[in-house]
Amino acid sequence: MDQTTEYIKQSLLNVEKSRREYQLFDDIFVYVKDQLPDHINLKNVLMSVERIIPYHLSKEVDGIYVGQFKDWSEREVNSMFKDASIFVTNEQDDDEDMIDDIIHEFAHSIESPMGDIIYTGGELQQEFVGKRKRLYFLIKSEGHDVSSEKFMNSEYDEKFDDFLYKKIGYEILSSIAMGLFITPYAATSLREYFATGYVEYLMGDRGYLMKVSPALYKKIEQLIGEIDED
């Protein structure tokens, strides 16, 4: 490669690195507040998200913002959905890690407008609480002094979250929860149970999700539109 060609190539790369604004589905504004590491290809990430997410399930998001945001370091947050926007950290391991974070927040974006499908009827909550009960007995059998009351609450509880991840520990929880929850994080709350299942359905092993969480699997299929609600 001659010097002129190399110069042009490098100039184009530099322009792409400095780019701040993108579009997703032609109607979702994407803004890079803080620069991504060199190994992350944001164009590839966004193209993958467009391919994975059904368009009709993307309409609750107006914008995606990439960077570091207030109070995130204390809360150890990678992403969040708030005010019709997805906020995602620029500190990503690889493209797939970032795709996972974005799709996870798209899941949260549809919880309220599609709650009649996701939560009405109680099947999903019943499945989740049943798994929480089994998790309680499994953790207790490991010698941990735990109260059953916290395990019956399907809402997010920061103290319970700290108990799972700081006292029990991710590795032990992963081992205990294997075959019960698709990921340890799915045990955190009913909302995270749904969101992690949504990611697994779209990016992971659908057969495993159907086996481990059949009620959750059916709810997601209803959302995708592949089967009737009945």
Describe the residue ranges of each PLM region:
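Auxiliary, metal-adjacent structural segments of Zn-dependent hydrolase domains
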Residues: E16-D95, T120, K140-S148
